[in-house]
Each structure stands twice: as structure tokens, then as C-alpha cells.
């Protein structure tokens, strides 16, 4: 059983998947930081609010300065600022993955399919006949060999 597990783990696709997950997690942290630390402060400044992560609606009705203060008071909140940050994270991640896949597909060499054999015409019934045929399948006439 241990040998089977070792064989399974050492397969190329399992290792590729593990590397992909690790790189994806690290890349996700980079995108998250770019959104939270670079993009959202600029957007927040343009809209007159500095911190998007503190945009929320208190469902209890009280006034709280931050999401943390509302949570400390036990007030339920709709954290739409955090939701906007997370949505922007997703959109940027999806765009980058789309561009990477598009570039990889462009680089990947595609094999051109072999050209289909051009059928010749039977001189007797004028039907299409395979180039290597010695007899017409339609009229059964004997055909001359092609050079």
C-alpha cells in the first residue's frame, strides 16, 4: 500500500498540481496585496473615503467608527467595503489567469493535421474514388494505377 501511494504521488500530474497550488496561493497573496495596498487606497481617495475595508452598514442601528468596533459591540454588519475588495481581487486574478492562459496557448505549438487524401474521379462513372483504389466502389470498373 505504501508503494502504491509513493507511485501515485510521484506521478507527474500530481506533482504539477502541487506546484501549481503553491504558486497559485503565493500569487493570490500578491494580487490581494496589490488590491488592498495599491488600488483600493487610490480608489478610496478618489471617492473621498480613505479605507474601503471600513465601509459597512450596521444592522443593529448603532453608529460605529469601524467594522471592528461594531463587531466588538456585537452588532451584525454588512461589510460591503470588504466585499468590494474581495470582488476586485477575484476580477484581477481572473484577468491575469486569462492572460496567462491566452499567452500559453499562443506559444504552444499546434500540429497541423495531415491533409486529407484528395480523391480521384472514376473515368467511367465520374464518382469520387480513393487515390489508392484499383477498382471503383460505385461501378466496379477496373482503374489504372496512379503513378
Swiss-Prot record:
**Superkingdom, natural source:** Bacteria
Location within or outside the cell: Cell inner membrane
Q: Which Gene3D superfamilies match?
A: Large-conductance mechanosensitive channel, MscL, domain 1 (1.10.1200.120)
Q: Which GO terms describe its cellular component?
A: plasma membrane
Q: Which UniProt keywords apply?
A: Cell inner membrane, Cell membrane, Ion channel, Ion transport, Membrane, Transmembrane, Transmembrane helix, Transport
Record's keyword annotation contains Ligase: no
- Which parts pass through the membrane? 8-28, 81-101
Q: Topology relative to the membrane, per the entry? A: Multi-pass membrane protein
Picking any one GO molecular function of the record gives: mechanosensitive monoatomic ion channel activity
Q: What does this protein do?
A: Channel that opens in response to stretch forces in the membrane lipid bilayer. May participate in the regulation of osmotic pressure changes within the cell.
Q: Known PANTHER family for this protein? A: LARGE-CONDUCTANCE MECHANOSENSITIVE CHANNEL (PTHR30266:SF2), MECHANOSENSITIVE CHANNEL MSCL (PTHR30266)
Give the family per the record.
Belongs to the MscL family.
Oligomeric form and interacting partners: Homopentamer.
Q: Which HAMAP family match?
A: MscL
What protein name is recorded for this chain? Answer: Large-conductance mechanosensitive channel
**Taxonomic classification:** Bacteria, Pseudomonadati, Thermodesulfobacteriota, Desulfuromonadia, Geobacterales
Amino acid at each position: 500500500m505504501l508503494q502504491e501511494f509513493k507511485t501515485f504521488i510521484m506521478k507527474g500530474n500530481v506533482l504539477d498540481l502541487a506546484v501549481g497550488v503553491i504558486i497559485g496561493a503565493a500569487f493570490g497573496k500578491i494580487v490581494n496585496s496589490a488590491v488592498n495596498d495599491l488600488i483600493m487606497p487610490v480608489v478610496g481617495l478618489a471617492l473621498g473615503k480613505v479605507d474601503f475595508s471600513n465601509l459597512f452598514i450596521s444592522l443593529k442601528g448603532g453608529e460605529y467608527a469601524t467594522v471592528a468596533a461594531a463587531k466588538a459591540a456585537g452588532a451584525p454588519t454588512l461589510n460591503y467595503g470588504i466585499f468590494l475588495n474581495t470582488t476586485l481581487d477575484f476580477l484581477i486574478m481572473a484577468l491575469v489567469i486569462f492572460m496567462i492562459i491566452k499567452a500559453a496557448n499562443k506559444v504552444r505549438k499546434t500540429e497541423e493535421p495531415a491533409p486529407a487524401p484528395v480523391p480521384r474521379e472514376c473515368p467511367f462513372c465520374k464518382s469520387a474514388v480513393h487515390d489508392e483504389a484499383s477498382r471503383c466502389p460505385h461501378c466496379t470498373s477496373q482503374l489504372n494505377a496512379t503513378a
